[in-house]
Amino acid sequence: LERIAVIDFETTGITPSSSCRATEIAVVILEQGRIVDRYQSLMNAGVRVPAFIEQLTGISSAMLRSAPPAEKVMNEVNEFVGITPLLAHNAAFDQKFWDFELGRIKRTRLQNFACSLLLARRLMPTAPNHKLGTLNTFAGLPHTGQAHRAMADAEMAANLTAHLATQLRQQHGLRELSHDLLCSLQKVPAAKINEHLKRHRGF
């Protein structure tokens, strides 16, 4: 599997706005199923962290006050990622924040997001649910640290993606795996996924 940048944001809410911003970002670079590089930073966007979010993530307003400005972090992380294809678990969420925070530094995303949640729904249908922690436990993958902190979640999503890639090769006979293929598989209706994968067998 080609080089992929797996991203996770911690935020103060669900939809980005002037009062709802990213508080932490982590990126792990996955290459041939292995994590080869990492970037992580808290980011100060000048917003207050609601109490329930602080309980969930352990990130407090006080921690953010001493963190680098969000714009500086996004410039760094944008340079770190470059044009590497992107992936996140529940990418619809992280994509919104990536685009919003990039927009604030006058940058535009050029690459697509693959989604390990959508892929797992299709490739791990017997899992009890498709939360990141559940899927990692179900697949017997290593515990990466505190859930709801960006680096632990990004590493979990990367390990899960490597597991899904192995499954595509071993169970479905796919030889050439690409980010484009992952992006196309996540759009196939779950009921038709096996039939769809048969057409790719041996390629």
Spans of features found by a protein language model:
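Short amphipathic alpha-helical face segments that pack within enzyme cores
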Residues: 97, 155-159
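Acidic two-metal-ion nuclease catalytic site recognized across multiple nuclease folds
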Residues: 158-203
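Generic alpha-helical structural context detector
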Residues: 118-121, 133-137, 159-162
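Conserved non-catalytic scaffold segment of RNase H-like nuclease domains
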Residues: 1-111, 125-148
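Short, glycine/acidic-enriched loop or turn micro-motifs at the edges of active sites
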Residues: 11-13, 118, 156
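Conserved beta-strand -> loop -> alpha-helix junction used to position metal-binding or nucleic-acid-contacting
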Residues: 108-120
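Acidic donor-binding loop at a coil-to-helix junction in glycosyltransferase catalytic cores
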Residues: 152
